[in-house]
């Protein structure tokens, strides 16, 4: 069987390029954001998300993260504006976290790592399918939200309560009537740059919108993510305690801010 990628020493991010050459590409994500080097771009517009809660379908443990999947067969849950020239359809969201609360996010801001990072993945509906969108530099838009430790967040708990149904790799459960807008911070300011998926095959097709303001969740809530397993039900248990990729070289890319 082909070696499967993961986050352990033997198959982790340092090895991904052996199977997925993109991982050593020129436009890889995540990156370290150094705010002193980021300039305000006054042409960047506000972004809007109009999500249909009825488009949420299932929640899945794929052995790498927990993912909530949406119906993207038509323009139903949409992201518009910001740096985007077209509307993008929400396909899924997932999370990255660490083994303790002092790290776990993939992007960092002036050296600060957050406890977790939420990624909402959308595809440009001018392309006739998600698979086609992956082949274009403007094919995918990901909204990244940082999670910091503080007060419990009730909306986040709705997601966490479903994790008991998907403890092990390969498990999937219904997850309906959820509007992910409830996980956005009040402030919509963002940084944007061109990058890649942070998991193999690491395709370089992503317009990133990283929200400046984190949302707050409790330490107990983040701990619940670590109760998932990267192993299947019939395998020796392997806890899914960390699933973040370290920062990648920026290689001359420009990061812009929507705010002063």
UniProtKB/Swiss-Prot annotation:
Residue span(s) of domain Alpha-carbonic anhydrase: 3-259
SUPFAM superfamilies: Carbonic anhydrase (SSF51069)
Compartmental location: Cytoplasm
One Pfam family this sequence matches: Carb_anhydrase
Modified residues (Phosphothreonine): 73, 216
Modified residues (S-glutathionyl cysteine): 182, 187
Regulation: Inhibited by acetazolamide.
Enzyme class: lyase
Descriptive protein name: Carbonic anhydrase 3
Organism of this sequence: Bos taurus
Gene it is expressed from: CA3
